[in-house]
């Protein structure tokens, strides 16, 4: 009987990526299969996030529920990973005696040996160190799970915004070598992946080593990935404005695989608040990036992050944010009420904006961006959009579901054979959270056919050294 693993994930896309790697690791380690039911599992893993308010208490509430399962099954192993584990590992162990493993984002690859220690009668294991980017060398080969895949290209952040815990929980910026990334994506493409989303806390700060000891910039990486046969759509997240250089903007001008959509967090439209946040740029510099992007790619749509009610935010500061929103015309946003994160510089500032004022401002901001997004959706009526078909529709399994370049969900009727491929769909209806379309053409009528498979590319460029170690030479 196979052993079962249950993973509960909170937080950003990086955490989702890490959880998928944990599942692959545990499958390779002892054939663990994932289960949605915690009560069925032999190992429970909680991948935590410290961005939101009361993150630590949320962890203890969850562990309290799992403690009851361990009382019924003493052999059950419970592990806590992610950013709260990295920041509060010792506190977790002191308050939750049921926890066996505590590991950070950079040490998840050590899970099998930690579990072996526990099974051998060892005490609870805590490993929240920052061993550079070692984890990528220890993880199993990538496995595709649908036509779209996330690939982490770097870890950590060195910007130290005053409100953010990421540099303290994930460490400084460290980039993966170029060859490792290209090899992983080529392997995914060979398994049917058509869309890749490059991941990093500050993805456009990527500076990866090449095989000849040069440094590959993020703009160069984008072009390398876009050139891989089978990868017809390319995304990345999350970016920082101060790293959004002209060479990246130039890629939008000549690389059609790069989607006409960008998530570029700004947090505030007030120069005074941006300075308090230690963002390193002013509102006009952010707008300059958007202006140059739209010159290079006129149809590009922008989403962003906003923090509402940062300490000292006045009515004029909020008005400046709304002015930026009006000037840029965002398609989407992730907007949140400010809450202090322990250990950050901003936590020492007086939180002098009332909760009622924060809620009112948040509602105003979200309402305005919803209006802007709806306007963009209506502009798509009657247009033909290229959709990557992900699978059956959630609401109607007799229909198919896919996404546009701008990540809008489109439901439409078509043959299931199109799942995993691109189709063209005419948009006929617009709803708040999705679009409806009619099938126009399949991939066999498009100019997307591969002339060379990723396997051919890998075979062409593989070289074994004297020790029999395979290297990928781009």
Swiss-Prot record:
Residues 378-441 form the TRAM domain. It is found in: Cytoplasm. [4Fe-4S] cluster 1 binds at residues 12, 49, 83. Its EC number is 2.8.4.3. Its cofactor is [4Fe-4S] cluster. Binds 2 [4Fe-4S] clusters. One cluster is coordinated with 3 cysteines and an exchangeable S-adenosyl-L-methionine. One of its GO terms (molecular function) is metal ion binding. Keywords: 4Fe-4S, Cytoplasm, Iron, Iron-sulfur, Metal-binding, S-adenosyl-L-methionine, Transferase, tRNA processing. CDD domains: Radical_SAM. InterPro entries: Elp3/MiaA/NifB-like_rSAM, Methylthiotransferase, Methylthiotransferase_CS, Methylthiotransferase_N, Methylthiotransferase_N_sf, MiaB_methiolase, rSAM, rSAM_horseshoe. The keyword Coiled coil does not apply. The keyword Chloroplast does not apply. [4Fe-4S] cluster 2 binds at residues 157, 161, 164. One of its GO terms (cellular component) is cytosol. It comes from the Bacteria. Residues 143-375 form the Radical SAM core domain. Residues 3-120 form the MTTase N-terminal domain. It catalyses: N(6)-dimethylallyladenosine(37) in tRNA + (sulfur carrier)-SH + AH2 + 2 S-adenosyl-L-methionine = 2-methylsulfanyl-N(6)-dimethylallyladenosine(37) in tRNA + (sulfur carrier)-H + 5'-deoxyadenosine + L-methionine + A + S-adenosyl-L-homocysteine + 2 H(+). Pfam families: Radical_SAM, TRAM, UPF0004. Catalyzes the methylthiolation of N6-(dimethylallyl)adenosine (i(6)A), leading to the formation of 2-methylthio-N6-(dimethylallyl)adenosine (ms(2)i(6)A) at position 37 in tRNAs that read codons beginning with uridine. Belongs to the methylthiotransferase family. MiaB subfamily. Monomer. This is tRNA-2-methylthio-N(6)-dimethylallyladenosine synthase.
């Amino acid at each position: 009987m196979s052993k079962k693993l249950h993973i509960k994930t909170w937080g950003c896309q990086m955490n989702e990526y890490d959880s998928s790697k944990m599942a692959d690791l545990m499958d390779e380690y002892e054939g663990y299969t994932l289960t949605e039911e915690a009560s069925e599992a032999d190992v429970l893993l909680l991948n935590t996030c410290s961005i939101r308010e009361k993150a630590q208490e949320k962890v203890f509430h969850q562990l309290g529920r799992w403690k009851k399962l361990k009382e019924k099954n003493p052999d059950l192993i419970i592990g806590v990973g992610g950013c709260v584990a990295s920041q509060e590992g010792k506190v977790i162990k002191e308050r939750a005696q049921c926890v066996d493993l505590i590991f950070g984002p950079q040490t998840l690859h050590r899970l099998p040996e930690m579990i072996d220690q526990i099974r051998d009668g060892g005490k609870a294991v805590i490993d929240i160190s920052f061993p550079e980017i070692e984890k990528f060398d220890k993880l199993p080969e990538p496995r595709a799970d649908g036509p779209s895949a996330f690939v982490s290209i770097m870890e950590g952040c060195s910007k130290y915004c005053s409100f953010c815990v990421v540099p303290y929980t994930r460490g400084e910026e460290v980039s993966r070598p170029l060859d490792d990334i290209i090899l992983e994506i080529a392997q995914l493409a060979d398994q049917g992946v058509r869309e890749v989303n490059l991941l990093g806390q500050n993805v456009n700060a990527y500076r990866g080593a090449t095989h000849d000891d040069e440094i590959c910039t993020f703009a160069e990486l984008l072009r390398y990935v876009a050139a891989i046969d089978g990868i017809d759509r390319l995304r990345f997240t999350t970016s920082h404005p101060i790293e959004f250089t002209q060479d990246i903007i130039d890629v939008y001008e000549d690389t059609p695989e790069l989607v006409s959509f960008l998530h570029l967090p700004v947090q505030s439209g007030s120069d005074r608040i941006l300075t308090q946040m230690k963002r390193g740029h002013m509102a006009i510099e952010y707008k300059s990036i958007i202006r140059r992007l739209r010159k290079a790619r006129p149809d590009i749509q922008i989403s962003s992050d906003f923090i509402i009610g940062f300490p000292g935010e006045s009515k004029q500061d909020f008005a400046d944010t709304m002015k930026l929103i009006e000037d840029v015309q965002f398609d989407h946003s992730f907007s949140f009420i400010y809450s202090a994160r322990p250990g950050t510089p901003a936590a020492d500032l007086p939180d002098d904006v009332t909760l009622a004022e924060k809620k009112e401002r948040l509602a105003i901001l979200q309402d305005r961006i919803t209006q802007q997004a709806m306007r963009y959706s209506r502009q798509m009526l009657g247009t033909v959009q290229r959709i990557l078909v992900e699978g059956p529709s959630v609401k109607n399994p007799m229909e198919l579901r896919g996404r546009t370049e701008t990540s809008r969900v489109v439901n439409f009727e078509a043959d299931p054979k199109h799942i995993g491929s691109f189709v063209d769909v005419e948009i006929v209806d617009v709803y708040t959270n999705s679009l409806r379309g009619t099938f126009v053409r399949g991939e066999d009528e498009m100019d997307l056919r591969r002339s060379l498979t990723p396997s051919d590319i890998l075979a062409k460029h593989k070289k074994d050294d004297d020790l029999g170690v395979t290297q990928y030479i781009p």
